[in-house]
Curated annotation (Swiss-Prot):
Record field: catalytic activity: (2R)-2-phosphoglycerate = phosphoenolpyruvate + H2O
Binding site for Mg(2+): D242, E286, D313
Primary role: Catalyzes the reversible conversion of 2-phosphoglycerate (2-PG) into phosphoenolpyruvate (PEP). It is essential for the degradation of carbohydrates via glycolysis.
Keywords of this entry: Cytoplasm, Glycolysis, Lyase, Magnesium, Metal-binding, Secreted
Cellular location(s): Cytoplasm; Secreted; Cell surface
One GO molecular-function entry: magnesium ion binding
The protein's name in its UniProt record: Enolase
Organism, scientific name: Syntrophobacter fumaroxidans (strain DSM 10017 / MPOB)
Enzyme nomenclature, EC number: 4.2.1.11
Length: 426
């Protein structure tokens, strides 16, 4: 048994300058692990609850001192002496200690910080990289990156409705080459935008955030950038979008300010996506329908699920009970995985396993409010997920994950493999 010797949490800042929770777990062997929790801007209504202080005089109400106190004063005394290598046992205890459906008493940010830090401490004690500790001997698949190079919606202060436009270098032979292809396309995209007199300031996730004449103009400039970088759209590099449709869904309709026909029914939204899939190498649509539009999701899946990856984020929130219902009802064909949506490492792994068993694909994801923590890079390899979303080719909190994947690829050597097009079952 490897006993937990101490647990300490602190308040740090994320990439948006908002407070978040960082925890450090030390084992009796002297090995330790430190983990920081991310935070989202567009969130599903059924996500595990992120505890904020609500004091307007401090960090505009976004402080996390209560969550930190919950770790230091309530969680720490009760987990000291527990087996640091028993991740399932620790996480089950934390869930029981909280006692709520959404981890709202202690805070999912408090619970997750301890869960992640304990996993890192145990990996260090075993003298294993985190991906090997969590995934075992079979962890060897480097994920295809979905690189968010144009930001809109809740991630940027512009007029673009679609939250993310991503380049997907699925045609690369290795992860390192995929990263290079993405970076070169990103730099060419900046040139394309500048040539059109468009703003090249970046949004929360490091992508450009220009005002555009329409949502489709974003697709057009992406195509130009891919070709300008010397790559073939639909062979070397594909396109993915995160509509985050819940953000513009109201009173049963979708309201898109950048469109000539701004109000759309579910059927019209599906036709909108179908038209794009016909004109562009659109390999993936995330949150194409609102989380509350279950019927719209089913219709979208019936219409496009055979040739486009349809990822559920807000609709599933990494929750196995909701994912199970989606699988049974024919909603989406892929699940986005975010650690802080559910709040423990164990529940995250359970969600991934459920998706894979149902024949769904899995995309490991960051949040718009990130830190230098690289856990999700290891998680992607540990689970052989095959796909990762961790932002653009700028901002160090995004690049940190890419650099960690480069290190993992180097460490795996000939035993590693880049997922490429095999990650997509469409």
């Amino acid at each position: 048994m490897s006993e937990i010797l101490s647990v300490k949490a602190r308040e740090i800042l994320d990439s948006r300058g908002n407070p978040t929770v960082e925890a450090e777990v030390i084992l009796d062997s002297g090995y330790s692990g430190t983990a920081a929790v991310p935070s989202g801007a567009s969130t599903g209504s059924r996500e595990a609850l992120e505890l904020r202080d609500g004091d307007p005089a401090r960090y505009l109400g976004k402080g996390v001192l209560q969550a930190v106190q919950n770790v230091n004063d309530e969680i720490a005394p009760k987990v000291i002496g527990m087996d640091g290598r028993d991740q399932v046992g620790l996480d089950s205890f934390l869930i029981e200690l909280d006692g709520t459906e959404n981890k709202g008493r202690l805070g999912a940010n408090a619970i997750l910080s301890v869960s992640m830090a304990a996993a890192k401490a145990a990996a260090a004690e075993c003298e294993l990289p985190l991906y090997r500790y969590l995934g075992g001997a079979m962890a060897s698949l480097l994920p295809v990156p979905m690189m968010n190079v144009i930001n809109g919606g809740a991630h940027a202060d512009n007029n673009v409705d679609i939250q993310e436009f991503m380049i997907v270098p699925a045609g690369a032979p290795t992860f390192g080459e995929a990263l290079r292809m993405g970076a070169e396309t990103f730099h060419n995209l900046k040139k394309v935008l500048k040539s059109k007199g468009l703003n090249t300031a970046v949004g929360d996730e490091g992508g450009f955030a220009p005002n555009l004449s329409s949502n489709e103009e974003a697709m057009e400039v992406l195509m130009q950038a891919i070709e300008a970088a010397g790559y073939r759209p639909g062979e070397d590099i594909y396109i993915a979008i995160d509509a985050a449709a819940s953000e513009f869904y109201k009173d049963g309709s979708y309201h898109m300010s950048a469109e000539q026909s701004p109000t759309k029914s579910a059927e019209e939204m599906i036709a909108f996506y179908e038209a794009w899939a016909g004109r562009y190498p659109l390999i993936c649509i995330e949150d194409g329908m609102a989380e509350g539009d279950w019927g719209g999701w089913q219709a979208l899946t019936r219409k496009l699920g055979y040739n486009v990856q349809l990822v559920g984020d807000d609709v599933f929130v990494t929750n196995t009970s909701i994912i199970a219902k989606g699988i049974a009802d024919g909603v989406a064909n892929s699940v986005l995985i975010k650690l802080n949506q559910i709040g423990t490492v164990t529940e995250t792994l359970q969600a991934i396993n459920m998706a894979f068993k149902a024949g769904y694909t899995v995309v490991i994801s960051h949040r718009s409010g990130e830190t230098e923590d690289t856990t999700i890079a290891d998680l992607a390899v540990a689970t052989n997920a095959g796909q990762i979303k961790t932002g653009s080719l700028s901002r160090s909190e995004r690049i940190a994950k890419y650099n960690q994947l480069l290190r993992i690829e180097e460490e795996l050597g000939a035993s590693g493999c880049y997922a490429g097009m095999s990650a997509f079952r469409v």
